[in-house]
Amino acid sequence: MYWKNGKLIPQEFLEDPDPMLVPMVYEVFRVYRHKPLFLSEHLERMFRSIDLLGFDKPYSLDQIQDHLFELLDTEPDRIGNIKIRLSWWPDPILEIGYIPHRYPTEKEQTEGVNVATFHAVRNTPNIKLWNAALRARTNQALKDLGVFEVLLVNENGQITEGGRTNHFYVKNSVLYTAPVSSVLPGITRQKVIDAAGILNLRVIEKYLLESKVGSVDEMFTSGTSAGVQPIAMVNGILLPEDKSITIFVQHVYNQMVEKEIGPNNYGW
């Protein structure tokens, strides 16, 4: 079941349109206990993307929220990821539906995952604009390399962001992340920065060179599906086992999630 321009359609979400023909902005967020996680932040970012592209907004924030809950009410106990996408071909088309997701296991959340670097950049990093070509390349890299995520590297050898995530690294108890001007300003990324403030951790926007990945004390990604996800290995280089700062940040972030969603309709 998905929602399209005023109608609930009894089938799974269709494939994304060809971005060469149809410009499309989108947002993806998790649904817990019949509640979308950090929905207002996602919708505000979507509207910023539309403004940066110079397109008209055919729906208000309140209208999109109302249509979203029309969909959620059809399957109130379902959990997962929902995509909201807005395309213009030739008239605006708003679609809302569940998409496949992959959440990390408990072991991955505690012990970390393997990632690899991948040389590619987003042309419009501050706009969440569908890029099918880059997504296909990163998906193939994930499959070929057998890793949880790929970290994008620019022409200067600097790590910018993940294929679906932002990334952070720790050095001498200071938290670093790539400059926001070169990445998608992730919702979870901002929550991590907020968590660092609660923990009195200093945060600096500074690139990590691909050649220096073995010099960090800790590294993790942040994103919709994974939340705060520790990294154990990069390009086959094993990182230190101590992930204490990552775990502290992860704990505070998880508290933010619980506060945001609250109890379900049954009180738990």
Can you say where each PLM-predicted feature lies in the sequence?
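Helix-start/capping segments and mature chain N-termini
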Residues: M1-E70, W89-W268
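Short secondary-structure junctions
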Residues: D73-G80, L201
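Ordered, amphipathic secondary-structure segments that act as subunit-interaction surfaces
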Residues: D77-R85, E95
